[in-house]
Structures are given as C-alpha cells and as structure tokens.
C-alpha cells in the first residue's frame, strides 16, 4: 500500500484496511481501463487485477469531504441500478439525508423538467458507471459533479471522483458505502470524534436476498407454542390428547357400529318393502288400444 497523501487525522486505521480486504474491495476485474491504471497495485497470475486499498481509502475521504461541503443534504442524489447496491444507497440516504434512486433510473430525471421525477441535485453518487450510465450522461448535460465506485474496467468518462473498488460484490459495495457514510457523519460532527465507533453495523448495508428475508419473516411470525402443543393442535384449535378412541362430548361411546342401540328393536326391512307393482304388460296393452 502506498503512503497516504492525507493529513494524519484522516489516515486509515488497521481495522479500516482489514474491513476493505475482508469485503474483497481490492479484487478487480481481469480487464483494465487506461484511466484506472494509477489505482492498480498488481496483477495476479490468473489475470485478476488487484486494486490499491490505500487509494480506495484516500478517495473515500475525498468524496466525504465533497459531500460534507454541501449545505443541504437533500441536494445529493445517490443512485444504484445494480441490485447489490440498492440496499446500500437507501441506508446511505437514510443516515445522511440524501435522495436515493434505487432501481431503474428514469430517463430525463435531470434534464426534462416536465416529468414528475425531475430533480436538480448538486452532486450525484453512482454505484457503477456502466449500469448507471444514463444518470452520468444526463449529469454531464447539466453540469452536475459525479462521484462513482469504479472497478478496474469501469468507464470513467464524465466521472469527477472515482473510488477504486470492486463494484460487483455485495460485500464490497456495502462496505464502501458504509465507510463513506461514516466519514460524512464524522466530518459533519454527528459522530463526536474519530475514536468513537459508529453504532451502525456494516452488515446493514449488505444486499440481502428477498427470499431469505421472507423466510426469516415467516419464522419470526410463527405462532408461539407450536413445539409444546403440536402443529395439529394449532391448526384445529383443540389440544392433541393422543387418545384417538375417546368419544367426543355429547355422543355415547359405542364399541361396534353393527350393534343395535340398547332399548331399540332392529328394523324389519321386509315389512317396509314397497307393494308389488301391477302387471306392466297389461298396462301397456290398454294404452295401445287408444
């Protein structure tokens, strides 16, 4: 890691570097753009480019100082069309007061004032310059500065501040957005000093599978006492007694269904038989005489 070009107060701690490495923020793509070469540390034998996490931290601090210089936090727009970054930008907006566009960017949001989604931000921050190309293109039309999380192969056209990091992994994206939000709050004074840890865990910025969240919600909403009473008791509303031979209330317990009830005579089926019908042949002969 190259020596930091920052004042000593902004130097990264060993914990910060360990978090960047644990989230694999240094793992770049196999392709390398010419404008991303200054942020390259080395290339592995398998062709994967390794980014310099020292440069990543310097750009995080620079971006945070730019964000903190804007008086109204609502004038900052954070954008992520990539699913892995949508949760991160929403949390960043909630903690810093910025506007979030998570999902598809509506064309004309920065240039067409007739649309309902029209915005006039003073700064935009995008998760991936490739997937958020429409937002960067419109920002260039109206002179909006752009901060972007750039991988080794990301296009840097119209990007003013590039934060070199892995922008395809959910842990890397969440970690960089979390560090950026923490640094902004430190510069604003929301976090008292740099020795005070932020009470928000980095896991809150990580992408979570919607199906996994739905399963966890079902587990949390499960009715209490299922283990004690049994599933059948919960569904039927009656406790499971385990005695299937017990008769329900209001009905006598009988041994065999073939046994006659006590005090009642067996029915005589011959006595109730219907009377014999007339001769069908004679009836038909009378009808034919007409």
Curated annotation (Swiss-Prot):
Record GO terms (molecular function): structural constituent of ribosome
PROSITE patterns, sorted: RIBOSOMAL_S2_2
Keyword Cell membrane: no
Chief location bin: cytoplasm
InterPro entries: Ribosomal_uS2, Ribosomal_uS2_CS, Ribosomal_uS2_euk, Ribosomal_uS2_euk/arc, Ribosomal_uS2_flav_dom_sf
Location of the region described as Disordered in the Swiss-Prot/TrEMBL record: 243-271
Keyword Ribosomal protein appears in the UniProt entry: yes
TM stretches of this protein: none
Gene3D superfamilies in the record: Glucose-6-phosphate isomerase like protein, domain 1
Extent of Low complexity compositional bias: 257-271
Localisation per UniProt entry: Cytoplasm
One Gene Ontology term, aspect cellular component: cytosolic small ribosomal subunit
GO biological process, one term: cytoplasmic translation
Highest taxon in the source lineage: Eukaryota
Family: Belongs to the universal ribosomal protein uS2 family.
Primary role: Component of the ribosome, a large ribonucleoprotein complex responsible for the synthesis of proteins in the cell. The small ribosomal subunit (SSU) binds messenger RNAs (mRNAs) and translates the encoded message by selecting cognate aminoacyl-transfer RNA (tRNA) molecules. The large subunit (LSU) contains the ribosomal catalytic site termed the peptidyl transferase center (PTC), which catalyzes the formation of peptide bonds, thereby polymerizing the amino acids delivered by tRNAs into a polypeptide chain.
Assembly notes: Component of the small ribosomal subunit (SSU). Mature N.crassa ribosomes consist of a small (40S) and a large (60S) subunit. The 40S small subunit contains 1 molecule of ribosomal RNA (18S rRNA) and at least 32 different proteins. The large 60S subunit contains 3 rRNA molecules (26S, 5.8S and 5S rRNA) and at least 42 different proteins. Interacts with rps21.
Name the UniProt record assigns to this protein: Small ribosomal subunit protein uS11
Species, as recorded: Neurospora crassa (strain ATCC 24698 / 74-OR23-1A / CBS 708.71 / DSM 1257 / FGSC 987)
Lineage of origin: Eukaryota, Fungi, Dikarya, Ascomycota, Pezizomycotina
